[in-house]
Amino acid sequence: MGTRILDLLQLQNLTKRDPSAYKEEFLLQYQHYLTQLQIFQLKPTKEFKHFSQLVSYLSHVCVCYPKELSEFPKQISDLLENNCNNLEPELRRILAKSLILMRNRNLLPQIQMLSLFFKLFRVHDKPLRSLLYSHIVADIKNTNLKQKNQKLNRTLQNFMFTMMNDDSEIASKMSLKVMIELFRKKIWHDTKTVNVISNGVFSKNSKILITTLNFFLHIDNPDKPDEEEEDEAVKEKRAKDNFRKKSLAHRVGKKTKGRITRLAKSKVDLKKAKQEEDNKLQPNFPAIELIHDPQGYCDKLFNVLVKTTEKFETRIMIMNFISRLIYVHKLMVYNFYPFLQKYLQPHQKNITYLLAVLAQSCHELVDPDVLKPLVMTIAKYFVNDGCGSDVIAIGLNTIRSICSRCPLAIDTVLLADLIQYREKKEKGVAMASKSLLQFFKDNYPSMLPKKERGKNKTDIGLLAFGHQKVSQGIDGLDLLMDEELNARLDAIEAGEEFESDDDSDSDSDDEGWEDVNTTTADDDNNSEWVSDDDDEEGEEDEEVEDEEDEEEVDEEELEDDEEGDWESGEEIEGDDDDDEEWEEVEEEVEEEEEEEIKPTKKKSQQKEKVEVLRTDDIKVLTDEELIRIRKLRILKEARENNKQYEDMDQDDDENGENVHGLIRPEDLQGAHKKKKEEKLERIARAKEGRDGGYGSKASRRDKTGKSTTNEYKAKVTKPFVLTLKTKKVRGKSLKSFRDKQIGQREHSARQKRGRH
């Protein structure tokens, strides 16, 4: 070539365009790199700028010359592995980026590179660790994008599990973060990964312990979700709000074609958003269910909790994790409840959180004798007249949560005392006490005093400890057969009003009464409006009247015969015998009819049972049908309690106990007054709306991200010569002296008004 190329970036560009034409230049740079590498291996120095440029150039053009650069990836990986602690941080990152570039072009084996990157986690270089972490997660995700590569995953998992027990705490923590991220992205979503992560709670490093606890406690709602997940959540919320607005407008306003179209479109958008969310959360089970030997694991973790010297915030996280294990796997850790009892004081830090942990650890297999002291302690310290209203409300709500899971934990005397708080003036206390009363009134009214049990309340039966209620078939299966309830649910989901058959029947009955009242005027005129159905009904009525007339004639004949029988005693005795025989025959006929009716009722009931059993045994219910049964049950409860279906559904979703049986501390607080703000908080809130409210427009104008308007450019930046012919300038120059005086006076008057 005639010209000498000095810039490596320019040479890189030209080499990619025509590799054969620039092969001599490439070989020259490659020889230069080899000499620099030998010098660098003997004595790594700070003068690495030229060497890093050569490495970057060769990593970009290695695709063009695969034979000549076959040893280049191994040389860079060996240099990083042997001299990682002696290299400069910037050079380490350049070498790592070059390896990533070659791995993306399939010039480096994946297992070899990932094993090297995991070893580089030991280096005290935070930017390098973040670079390696992001690449490892992305590389494994792309490998398993189309289908699971089980062989590769097994090899990487085994290597990563050994890194969990590495001497370097930084490497162990980064390996743990990689596994958590891969599990959260549904890439390594298996029991092996979960059980390796679960061993992090026994680590002596506090950071590893807290990371593991956060994983198990917030697996369904991570602390820092991805931007894509946030966008999808916002999109689903926006679609749900839009559907509610359109359905309300359609239900309340006039039924126009445009509103119907907009409602249908909003329904389609909401369905798409829900499908995206369901596809994203396809494996929809928490990691806590995949732990091996949960009883032994929980006992071991409780021993760690008793002996630990961690901060109190970390200890209550361990308590929360143990309580979730106890509830999910129905464990018996009886030492855990007396351990919690010593924290049950109103002045205890994070007491609401601890009460939620206690209520969450209760289930039907826990011995009530273990929970009764806890309930008595809560009633003693939280539910008394000396405590504040917020404390009493929290105590009552906690007792209700415990009793909803283990109703035998409270005795009737204490229950009778607690329900008396419903007469208090404080709203939170009254609502909490009424909630406790309503729970026992709906489920176990026999535990309440007689005057509080209510009417038509059936006791579902308070089972003894260790007994379970065995259900036959699927609960609520009969609701799928209820046509009216299904039609009402379809109408609600479509955003339309539903008119029940009862209303139509009542309307028809009312119309019938009106017709009877109006027929007293003119029978002839009204007879013209009689329909064919009315004619048929009239014919049936005439037949019934004829039969009744015949019965009356027979009764009159019998009465005449009886009157004639009084004339002779012999005839009377004979007829009396006949009457007795007639009465006996009638009684026998009635008994036979009743016996015929009873078997038919039994047969119909047996048929209904057989039909239910057949649908349970033969037909496999789909997920959609199970979801519909749940919706129908909610709608039925809403109709019985005179509530709106939307409110019942929303309450069911917002209730913390319905999400994997968890209890949130906010659920125990109930209705409470808003806390009064302090002075500094009020000042800060008042200043929020004042930012940029004062000063000139130029100072308040956003300097970044916005361009100036043409009007502003014409006013400030335009040369005056170009504005001589404008209307504004010519108007000023052509003004008379009188007009100028008037304008000056108005200007001075405006200034004076502005001063005062």
From Swiss-Prot:
Q: Read off the InterPro entries from this record.
A: ARM-type_fold (IPR016024), Sda1 (IPR027312), SDA1_C (IPR048292), SDA1_MD (IPR007949), SDA1_N (IPR012977)
Which gene specifies this protein's sequence? Answer: sdad1
Which keywords fit this entry according to its UniProt record?
Answer: Coiled coil, Nucleus, Protein transport, Ribosome biogenesis, Transport
Q: Where is the composition biased (Basic and acidic residues)?
A: 605-615, 677-691, 736-749
GO CC, sorted alphabetically, is: nucleolus
Q: What is the lineage of its organism?
A: Eukaryota, Amoebozoa, Evosea, Eumycetozoa, Dictyostelia
Localization recorded for this chain is: Nucleus, Nucleolus
UniProt-listed GO biological process terms: protein transport; ribosomal large subunit biogenesis; ribosomal large subunit export from nucleus
- Protein family membership: Belongs to the SDA1 family.
Instruction: List the biased-composition ranges (Basic residues).
Output: 725-735
Regions of biased composition (Acidic residues) lie at 494-514, 521-596, 647-656
Recorded coiled-coil stretches: 227-282
Q: Specify the domain of life of the species encoding this protein.
A: Eukaryota
Q: Any idea what this protein is called?
A: Protein SDA1 homolog
PANTHER family recorded for this chain?
A: HSDA/SDA1-RELATED, PROTEIN SDA1 HOMOLOG
Q: Which residues cross the membrane?
A: none
Which intervals of the chain are annotated as region Disordered? 494-615, 638-756
**Organism, scientific name:** Dictyostelium discoideum (Social amoeba)
**What is this protein for, i.e. what is its function?**
Required for 60S pre-ribosomal subunits export to the cytoplasm.
